[in-house]
Regions:
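Short acidic, glycine/serine/threonine-rich loops at helix termini
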Residues: 12-14, 90-94, 118-126, 192-196, ...
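Conserved, well-ordered active-site substructure
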Residues: 349-352, 356-410
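C-terminal structural cap/anchor segments
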Residues: 293, 297-356
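Glycine-rich, highly charged phosphate/nucleotide-binding loops
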Residues: 30-32, 37, 54-69, 332-335
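A structural-propensity feature for long, helix-poor, extended segments
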Residues: 41-51, 295-298, 387-422
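Conserved, well-structured core segments that form the ligand-binding/active-site neighborhood
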Residues: 126-289
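Cap/lid and interdomain-hinge subdomains that line or gate substrate/regulatory clefts
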Residues: 22-24, 44, 55-79, 83-197, ...
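N-terminal basic/disordered segments at the start of proteins
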Residues: 1-42, 62, 110-115
Length: 427
């Protein structure tokens, strides 16, 4: 699987892990002959984060093609293109590049993720029943979707023919070449498309973790039993500190953080985002505060303010610097990742981290020299627990808009306990 950010790679890998298929996530784009593939040779499913969501379309396409070519040289024969469920990023350019690189003639595309309230009805993305362009999630500081109509959004970045199908019996001639956008409002709808097209057909599937789950279920019927998703209420007498980094500005993540801060031992370390961008916030002082909380056995919650005034200020900083809307966010994510890595390195007993926002998690893992994660459990659908490939650091990654009000609190409750049951495959 090839994804344009880390949380997307992780939640899609989780969809396969939940159905009994060992899964790993690698930080890409991959080199022509990636040694990293050898570190995950036991995995049945490998998801690669190309970190291309905010790159120019042509550059994103080249990175995806290079990654697919590297995977093919490593022996991979089946591919899935992960795209954002709300059409952010370079969906059209990356699907076109991946079609060419993997040698398929047609892509079946459906970004629906019903478990997270994302559906495709009449060719348009809806979020909890609301048209994407009217939903709060459409306001993304890094650049949101250009249209709720999937075909229109893709067509802005590709010249391939794009057809639409509402029902499986409408596929017909459209399956010869190009892109076919299909509707799905439920997991059962997604399963019907998989049953209609089949696992052995020469198509490129492209979608979110929702479609990946349908493919995983069909694959598992042939090969493996499903796993149980973790219940965060699992009792444990063990208490270990957890660092939670809320890098996403999404209102859902902010509500989850507020609920998390009601837990015993949870302490907030808040930094002004504009100050971070301007270099006015001391990274050493913030690291010292975080380490102090962890050494006292508490849960450190590191975040930035997310008011409308803050958003406007960050946008203005980007314009002043001559950059696009996502520039300030990228700098903040890199800074939060650097703080997270420094806290882990300073407090060697720390083994549990939660990150909302893929850029933050990726920055921290790169600082730590970790090539990627293996999936070892789940907090809830779309919210995986990973363990770094080369150490015993447990990492929960979560897309900003995913989960319910208690998701971060549940994640901390689970991670503060004994994680060995997940690591040895009994999750």
């Amino acid at each position: 699987m090839v994804a344009d950010d880390l949380t997307g790679a992780a939640d899609t890998a989780l969809a396969f892990w939940e159905h009994g298929l060992d899964a790993a996530i690698l930080l890409g784009p991959l080199a022509p002959r990636p040694a990293a593939l050898q570190t995950v040779s036991d995995a049945r499913v490998v998801a690669v984060d190309t970190a291309t969501r905010r790159r120019p379309p042509a550059a994103a396409g080249r990175a995806v093609a290079a990654t697919v070519n590297a995977l093919r040289r490593g022996g991979v024969t089946r591919f899935y293109k992960k795209i954002d469920s709300t059409l952010r990023g370079n969906c059209g350019a990356e699907i076109e590049a991946m079609l060419a690189a993997c040698g398929a003639s047609v892509a079946v595309v459906c970004p629906a993720f019903p478990a997270q309230g994302r559906t495709v009805v009449d060719g348009r993305v809806r979020v909890h029943g609301q048209d994407l362009m009217a939903a709060p999630i459409a306001v993304d500081p890094g650049g949101g979707a250009a249209s709720s109509r999937v075909a229109e959004a893709l067509g802005r970045q590709t010249r391939l023919p794009i057809a639409e199908a509402r029902r499986p019996d409408e596929l017909g001639q459209s399956m010869r070449r190009g892109i076919v956008v299909v509707d799905a409002a439920t997991d059962a709808d997604l399963a019907r498309w998989v049953d209609r097209v089949g696992l052995d057909s020469d198509v490129l599937w492209a979608g979110s973790a929702g479609l990946a789950g349908a493919l995983a279920r069909a694959t598992a019927r042939r090969t493996a039993p499903a796993r149980r998703v973790a219940a965060a209420e699992a009792a444990s007498s063990v208490w270990r500190p957890v660092v939670v980094v809320v890098g996403s500005l999404h209102a859902v993540s902010r509500g989850q953080m507020a609920a998390l801060l009601t837990l015993p031992g949870a302490t907030l370390v808040s930094c002004h985002p504009a100050g971070i961008v301007r270099g006015q916030v001391s990274i050493d002082e913030v690291v010292e505060r975080c380490v102090g909380i962890v050494r006292e056995g508490g849960h450190c919650v590191l975040s930035t303010s997310a008011s409308e005034e803050t958003r406007r200020e960050l946008a203005e900083l980007g314009r002043e610097a001559g950059h696009g809307p996502g520039w300030a966010g990228e700098r903040i994510a890199a800074w939060l990742g650097a703080v997270t890595a420094a806290v882990i390195q300073a407090e060697m007993g720390l083994e549990r981290v939660i990150c909302t926002g893929g850029d933050t998690a990726r920055a921290a893992l790169l600082r730590l020299g970790a090539p990627g994660l293996t999936v070892v459990g789940a907090v809830s659908p779309g919210v995986p627990i990973g363990r770094t490939i080369d150490s015993r650091l447990y990492v929960v990654t979560k897309a900003g808009g995913f989960g319910g009000q208690d998701t971060l609190a549940r994640a901390v409750t689970l991670l503060q306990g004994d994680m060995e049951e997940w690591a040895d495959g009994r999750g």
